[in-house]
């Protein structure tokens, strides 16, 4: 599938090169350097076709990873491999940098030998790789037959993401519901578009081979499966949630999710992403922005912006930032705000208003007088939207964790012996209001 894999530094020098197919020549290395890394204009597309050769590339810091092929391949699978390769390297030697790659090039070649077989991705689970590739990239010569059989069963068996014999003095399980809410609202307060992208990230430090069961809202409606509509969700309030699409970690038993709407799995060791989802129905919008812009002649603007928090008074939003755009011919700005600090940034053509914390069901406002330089340009100011950043301690989609259970029959510890933590974090994505 993948004809070759190349890792470049910011100058276009090849740090790692591995060719899997005879149809990929040395000229492919130079073609990517000239047409992508040294291109006069920034290459925005992650896929570049040069002389009937496709280059799938990602960039981490100043390092380029490029997968090359001349075949019609599954692009999503290639990018999944590239991002997984980045995660594996980060797990082994930390930050992906030129120095770290040069210091660990033997380890990287060893990883590629295990992860890719003739260009086909095989095993990219960090936990499984670490059982037979050490931190220094040197395989142990003193493995017993029992240890070797454990490695073989882990790599080829059904539970390749977790090794046997894991032991912890204290069994802990951390679950984070991380959501990004995106909004475009009209000046009159009408929602033009809104969606939430969410992830369920877990950190498991559990002994043995535990069975975990994770339950969400009383009712989950998967829109694309046709098992419910938005009306059903609205009737039951936030006891239910309508999900447009979702993907799971390979450890999840999908059959149980389809029948019971519960997530059952044997967890990998350490940190991993259990679930990723997207929803567009019944979103809780944490803030509403009410703008008022009034033109006073041709050389003055009066701006008033009110923000209202739309969540429980017991909750606190943090890291609030409102960016109010100003015209290019702005000469001066006078700002008065009820709460927080506001400053005009000429380099960004915007008034930046920052509030450290804000409780639910509160409102605050900012007023500004903007002085404008006379201009001969008859074109009216386009009035870019007001954008907002924030962080709230709840899930804007309404997703709730109802239960999180752990069973380990062999080691004889129960759900009550496990320390469990659940955290909700909602952040702004592209959160804009037209003015």
Swiss-Prot record:
GO terms for cellular component: AP-2 adaptor complex; cytoplasmic vesicle. One of its GO terms (biological process) is clathrin-dependent endocytosis. Residues 170-434 form the MHD domain. It holds the Pfam family Clat_adaptor_s. A 1,2-diacyl-sn-glycero-3-phospho-(1D-myo-inositol-3,4,5-trisphosphate) binds at residues 341, 345, 354. It is a peripheral membrane protein. It is found in: Cell membrane; Membrane, Coated pit. It comes from the Eukaryota. InterPro entries: Adaptor_comp_med_subunit, AP2_Mu_C_sf, AP2_Mu_N, AP_mu_sigma_su, Clathrin_mu, Clathrin_mu_CS, Longin-like_dom_sf, MHD. Keywords: Cell membrane, Coated pit, Endocytosis, Lipid-binding, Membrane, Protein transport, Transport. The keyword Transmembrane helix does not apply. CDD domains: AP-2_Mu2_Cterm, AP2_Mu_N. One of its GO terms (molecular function) is lipid binding. Adaptor protein complex 2 (AP-2) is a heterotetramer composed of two large adaptins (alpha-type subunit and beta-type subunit), a medium adaptin (mu-type subunit) and a small adaptin (sigma-type subunit). Belongs to the adaptor complexes medium subunit family. Component of the adaptor complexes which link clathrin to receptors in coated vesicles. Clathrin-associated protein complexes are believed to interact with the cytoplasmic tails of membrane proteins, leading to their selection and concentration. AP50 is a subunit of the plasma membrane adaptor. The complex binds polyphosphoinositide-containing lipids. This is AP-2 complex subunit mu. It comes from Xenopus laevis. The gene is ap2m1.
